[in-house]
């Protein structure tokens, strides 16, 4: 790239870096702010003692009674793996998978839209029709058509096997 195009590329990548950082910071803040506080010992059914002790310690640190589970892996994974209470697992799962989508200061929707638009602008500036075409060019697939061809081959190969497993 030369001249204005080069300057535009610099501006876009600078904005992309800032937006990516903002996205990550929002994700971290939302993760840090969430807590599932349980006060009924029956709700801990199925959890290993180590997870219960860690949740009790987290509750003490936060100055609350009971047990606190967070979206951080050392708390989240044991809860999702071992907790008997399906409703509580669902609550924690939904909290984890809807981070930064709520109507609050950590919502990443606009950031994601801006990142997608910048990706498109960068791709077009470099002579590609879209960002997927740009990113695939340097990879094994090289084109979107090649990706779809591979996916269809996998589908053809694995569909009969999957039906066999369904009938078991």
Q: What does each model-identified segment do?
A:
Residues 146-162:
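Extended, domain-scale alpha-helical bundle/helix-rich regions
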Residues 1-142, 157, 161:
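His/Asp/Glu-rich acidic catalytic environments and adjacent acidic regulatory segments
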Residues 164-168:
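Conserved small/polar residues in nucleotide/adenosyl-binding loops
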């Amino acid at each position: 790239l030369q001249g204005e195009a080069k300057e535009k590329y610099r501006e876009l990548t600078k904005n992309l870096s800032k937006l990516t950082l903002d996205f990550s910071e929002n994700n971290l803040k939302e993760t840090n702010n969430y807590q599932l506080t349980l006060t009924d010992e029956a709700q801990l059914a199925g959890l290993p003692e180590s997870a219960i002790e860690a949740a009790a310690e987290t509750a003490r640190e936060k100055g609350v009674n009971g047990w606190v589970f967070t979206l951080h892996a050392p708390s989240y994974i044991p809860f999702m793996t071992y907790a008997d209470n399906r409703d509580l697992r669902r609550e924690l799962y939904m909290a984890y998978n809807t981070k930064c989508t709520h109507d609050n200061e950590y919502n990443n929707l606009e950031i994601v839209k801006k990142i997608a638009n910048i990706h498109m602008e960068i791709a077009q500036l470099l002579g590609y029709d879209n960002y997927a075409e740009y990113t695939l060019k340097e990879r094994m697939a090289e084109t979107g058509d090649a990706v779809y061809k591979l996916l269809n081959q996998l589908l053809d190969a694995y569909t009969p096997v999957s039906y066999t497993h369904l009938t078991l």
